[in-house]
Amino acid sequence: MSRNDSISRNDLHGEISRHDRPDRRRVLVAGSALVGASVIPGVAGAAEAGLASAAELTVRTRAFLAGLDQDKRKTASFEWDGKEWRGWNYFGFPSVTKPGLRLEQMDAAQKDLGWALLATVMSPEGLKKARNVMTLQDVLMELGDGVGQRSPERFSFAVYGTPSDTGVWGFRLEGHHLHQSIAMRDGQIVSVSPSSFSCNPNRVTSGRHAGLVTLQAEEALARRLIGDLGPRLQGRARLSNTPIDNILSYAGRERANGRKVGLPASELSSAQSDLLWQLIEIYAVDHLSSPLASAQKARLRTGDREAVHFAWYGPNTPERAFGYRVIGDGFVIELGSVDPAAQHLHTIYHDLSNVLGRQA
């Protein structure tokens, strides 16, 4: 187990350990607006309408639960909005597993039901990225990290509340460097965040999976954008020469980091603005199935597009640590480099209008 993956058992429900908690200097670098930033202009009421019908997801979630025996169903089921739902995270270390029923605990038919459930809300690209994150558990073991303890199937499926056309309930896929929370209200999908596809290593250079790159677009588009800015705009966008080494918007602080810092989109050229929105949609749209993706794209654009801010941290040098944040009227995106070579990356996307099914 690597130092950067270590957290204590008390961290399971959202408390961040000394290896994952951003220190005070990092918080100040990211912007001095962590306090009092929960009310974001343009967010309140933005998620009153659902994103898409939850009918198929409800049917497939019921089918998944029906395919489990009583003990497995109990393992996969939790109350709505309890400590497990609120205590999301994407951390992972071999000795402790996530709440829910793990793939490694399912038989082949149950796995098929689980993947069919995921396919109702995730695009083929999203499913591939999730599988890539899972595959990296094998890569870590090949590198001698967690041998005999990690598994590409140590990822949990969990249902929160009762799948129904009325009321509120949720579904979650969670494991090391992977987190997807979906919340439903009265037959509608209302929230698709937090969403995290993280990785270690991002670029696999040896072994059976050599050539695999998990967060290629997340890195390439952001580096291209900061590199395309002239010196003056780069100076506005770069808030620190020191990269951020982790996300700041962790469990319980999802809305605490929404103050806009960095370079506003109003100062970008048309081509640069297009790059920025490609980057945003990589995090918030492209991993989702249609028509959910179309509805999510429309929600993102309900705010002021010109007021979206892009903030960069660290150098823009290949294979060197970097970080960035993108903040809009109703969302925040973060990427941090845990290691100096930009191989261990943590990312997050939050819909600030509807965090875990709770409206702003």
Question: What is the predicted role of each segment?
Answer:
Residues 4-5, 14-17, 42-44, 63, ...:
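Generic secretory/membrane-interface signal
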Residues 49-70, 75-123, 127-215, 219-360:
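A cross-kingdom marker for long, charged
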Residues 1-23, 33-37:
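N-terminal secretory signal peptides
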Residues 20-26, 35-52:
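N-terminal twin-arginine translocation
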